[in-house]
Amino acid sequence: MENIRTLAEVDPEIARVLREETQRQEEGLELIASENFVSPAVMEAVGSVLTNKYAEGYPGKRYYGGCEVVDVAENLAIARAKDLFGADAVNVQAHSGSQANMGAFMALMKPGDTMLSLDLNSGGHLTHGATFNFSGKLYKVVHYGLTRDTETIDFAQVESLAKEHKPKVIVVGASAYPRTLDFAKFREIADAVGAAMLVDMAHIAGLVAAGVHPSPVPVADIVTSTTHKTLRGPRGGLVLSREPYAKAINSQIFPGIQGGPLMHVIAGKAVAFKEALSPEFKAYQRQIVANAKALAEALQRAGLRLTSGGTDNHLMLVDLRPKKLTGKVAEEVLDKAGITVNKNMIPFDPEKPMTTSGVRVGTPAITTRGMREAEMAVVGRLIGEALDAAQDDAALARIKGQVKELSQGFPLYASRLK
C-alpha cells in the first residue's frame, strides 16, 4: 500500500530535514528559553492516528460521529490539567498560546475595551497589545513598564495607569522577564479598579506546576499558557479559569476562533500533563531554576551584564552593550559556536527589534538533557569566550567542537540518527 512507505521513501528531502535537525539538537546547546525537548511518549502521541480525526465541538457534544475514542483523550487532558494546576475549568483545544490569549480576551472584552499590559520592549508578549498584533488592533491598550534602577515591574506605574484608564482587563505575564511575578499585588490593583485579571504564564507554567513559582490560578480570573516551554509538552495552548468564565471561553475557542481541534496534539498534552504530575518533573523544575542561577553567575564571571542583576526563574537577559555587540550579532556568533539563543530587546533598549541590545538565555532544554550546575559553569564560560572571539571564525569552530563534546555526554535523540 502507498501509505505504508517510509518517509525516506516518500520524501527524502523532508527525511533529510528531520535527520539534520535531530543532529543539530543533539550536538548543540539549546538555550532559547521558550524551547524544550519532549519525551518520546509525547512524540508518539502527536505522531499518531489521532491526526486523522475531526472532532469539532467538545467531549460528548461533537458535530461529528466517531468521536467516542478521542473524547477519552480530551477528557484525560482536561482532568490532568485540573489536577496539575488546581483549576476549576480547563480548555485544552487552543492550537497555540496566541489563540489561547485570543479566546480569553474575547471572553472578557469587546472590541474597543481597554487592557493594561506589560510593554513588549519591557519583556511582554506581542499578543498583549502590540500594535501590529490582533490584540493591539481590536482593543485599546495601555502599557506599563519597568523601573530604570531595578529593571523590575513598576507597580507604582501599574497602579497609577489602572486608576487613570480603568481597564476592563489587567494582563500579567511576560516572554522575557527574569524575576518572580507578584500576582497578589496585581490582584489588589485589579480589584481596586474593578478589572478582571488575566495571567499568561506560558513561560513559567512548568515552574508553577511544580510549585517552584507562585501559582496565579488561585488569584486570577483566567490563566492562559502554552503547553511546551517549561511544561515540556507539544506545541499548543491551554486556558484555565474560574467556573463562571468557562462557558464563554469554550464558545470563543470553538466556534469563535477555531474549527476542529488537533486531537493528536491534545493527546500529547494529556501525556505531558501526566508526566508533569510526577515527582521527577518537580525535581526537574527545581533543577531548571538552580541551573539558571548557576548559569547567570557563570555569565557574570565572564564579564556579562544581566538585566535586573540575575534571575529567579528559567531565563535571563544579557545586556551586550558593554561588549559593543548587538543581540543580532551575538546570536549569529553563538550559532557559529553551536550555541542557540535568540536576540531580545532589553529594558529601555535603544536598538530596533530586529537588532536589539541583548540576548535571551534559558535553561529548560539543557536541563532536560541532564545537565546540572557544573555544566552551567562550562556553558557560561563558552558563551563568554565565543562573544570575545566574535570576529575569529577559527576560535568559534574550536568552541563548537567543545560544545559538541559536552553535548555528546548528555544524549537526547541519538538513537534516531542510527
Curated annotation (Swiss-Prot):
Keywords, in A-Z order: Amino-acid biosynthesis, Cytoplasm, One-carbon metabolism, Pyridoxal phosphate, Transferase
InterPro entries (alphabetical): PyrdxlP-dep_Trfase, PyrdxlP-dep_Trfase_major, PyrdxlP-dep_Trfase_small, Ser_HO-MeTrfase, Ser_HO-MeTrfase-like, Ser_HO-MeTrfase_PLP_BS, SHMT-like_dom
Pfam families: SHMT
MF terms (GO), sorted A to Z: glycine hydroxymethyltransferase activity; pyridoxal phosphate binding
Positions bearing N6-(pyridoxal phosphate)lysine: 229
Pathway info: One-carbon metabolism; tetrahydrofolate interconversion; Amino-acid biosynthesis; glycine biosynthesis; glycine from L-serine: step 1/1
Sites where the protein binds (6S)-5,6,7,8-tetrahydrofolate: 120, 124-126
GO terms of biological process kind: glycine biosynthetic process from serine; tetrahydrofolate interconversion
Entry GO terms, CC: cytosol
Reported cofactor(s): pyridoxal 5'-phosphate
Domain of life according to the entry: Bacteria
EC id: 2.1.2.1
Site (Plays an important role in substrate specificity): 228
Annotated signal peptide: none
Record's catalysed reaction(s): (6R)-5,10-methylene-5,6,7,8-tetrahydrofolate + glycine + H2O = (6S)-5,6,7,8-tetrahydrofolate + L-serine
Record-linked PANTHER family: SERINE HYDROXYMETHYLTRANSFERASE (PTHR11680:SF50)
Subunit comment: Homodimer.
Record function comment: Catalyzes the reversible interconversion of serine and glycine with tetrahydrofolate (THF) serving as the one-carbon carrier. This reaction serves as the major source of one-carbon groups required for the biosynthesis of purines, thymidylate, methionine, and other important biomolecules. Also exhibits THF-independent aldolase activity toward beta-hydroxyamino acids, producing glycine and aldehydes, via a retro-aldol mechanism.
Similarity comment: Belongs to the SHMT family.
The protein, known as: Serine hydroxymethyltransferase
Organism for this UniProt entry: Myxococcus xanthus (strain DK1622)
